[in-house]
Swiss-Prot record:
PANTHER family: ORIGIN RECOGNITION COMPLEX SUBUNIT 2. Belongs to the ORC2 family. Essential protein. Component of the origin recognition complex (ORC) that binds origins of replication. DNA-binding is ATP-dependent, however specific DNA sequences that define origins of replication have not been identified so far. ORC is required to assemble the pre-replication complex necessary to initiate DNA replication. This is Origin of replication complex subunit 2. Induction: Regulated by E2F. Accumulates rapidly after cell cycle reactivation by sucrose addition following cell cycle arrest mediated by sucrose deprivation. The keyword Nucleus applies. GO terms for molecular function: DNA replication origin binding. Disruption phenotype: Zygotic lethal mutant phenotype. Seeds abort early, with embryos made of up to eight cells, characterized by enlarged nuclei in endosperm with arrested cell cycle. These phenotypes are partly suppressed by mutation in MEA/MEDEA. Expressed in female gametophyte and embryos, and, at low levels, in trichomes, pollen and the mesophyll of leaves. Follow a cell-cycle regulation with a peak at the G1/S-phase. Mostly expressed in siliques, flowers, flower buds and leaves, and, to a lower exent, in roots and stems. InterPro entries: ORC2 (IPR007220), RecA-like_ORC2 (IPR056772), WHD_ORC2 (IPR056773). Coiled coil: none annotated. It is found in: Nucleus.
Amino acid sequence: MEDIENIEEDEYGFSRNYFLAKELGGASKRSAHKLSDIHIVDEQELRETASTIEMKHSKEISELMSDYKTMYSKWVFELRCGFGLLMYGFGSKKALVEDFASASLTDYSVVVINGYLPSVNLKQVLLALAELLSELLKCKRKSSGSLSKGQETFPSRSMDDILSFLHGPQSGDKDCFICVVVHNIDGPALRDPESQQTLARLSSCSHIRLVASIDHVNAPLLWDKKMVHKQFNWLWHHVPTFAPYNVEGVFFPLVLAQGSTAQTAKTAAIVLQSLTPNGQNVFKILAEYQLSHPDEDGMPTDDLYSASRERFFVSSQVTLNSHLTEFKDHELVKTKRNSDGQECLNIPLTSDAIRQLLLDLNQ
């Protein structure tokens, strides 16, 4: 009985103290501080500071990457067998996948889709793939001396017709395929059902092999059983790299930083440095033209192709279109028509920002 009475007294004392504290708290004066009074560091300053942080366990990570390189031949074999490769694990897999493509996929054409971008135009990607496949088939027929013309061009620009062309039996060579690398297939611009269905149909095409990476823990929920086993035909590879998301993080505002609405030269330089040297050189030609012709609507696409081909930065219109698709996906270049009806390319940055961008690229 005494124990029960003691428990009741303790509970009464606790509840009484609780309500007394609430009364005192309600009567107390509120702080005059505001959330806007907090000093928020500049985003560029925060990124520069973060870039100086030394990576820990660099020796172990280097050994881990060396182990992954021994698996490159196996991954190529799996692609040739018709599987899609899905890379998952902690850390950015962008550098690993690109190293695999540059080291082991040299016998194939490779097209890269950056799923971490705010927007991705999949129809433009499919058009570029169809044009590239058409060129590959022409080259193979010339080298084999075949007189059969076959279907060398796709009949229309509808998504269904393009996918049918990519899936068609235009070549008996099982190794006649294009490797499509998708960084962050679970990225914000690709998470909608329509984009995932398009990618699944693309992956099931006979002339396409997919190498993709995911980072979101719930990424597998994007697909149903048919997509996983029959269309994507995934082989899952656990490849944690523990690498920072330097490039992928550029397009997302930092929680602790003050965001900027305008695209800065620093951000554009980081994006361009992730592209191929030829892609950077094509962009430099466009930037230099825009600085020397400030009163024009932009550089005509035909002029950019001629200038790039003269300097051996591109070998065909297909190659230039591939670079332009990357520029547009990164929102580095915009297109519009001038008074003569020509398609012109324009960099949506001020002249000072373009000059600073060229200085950053030349360093």
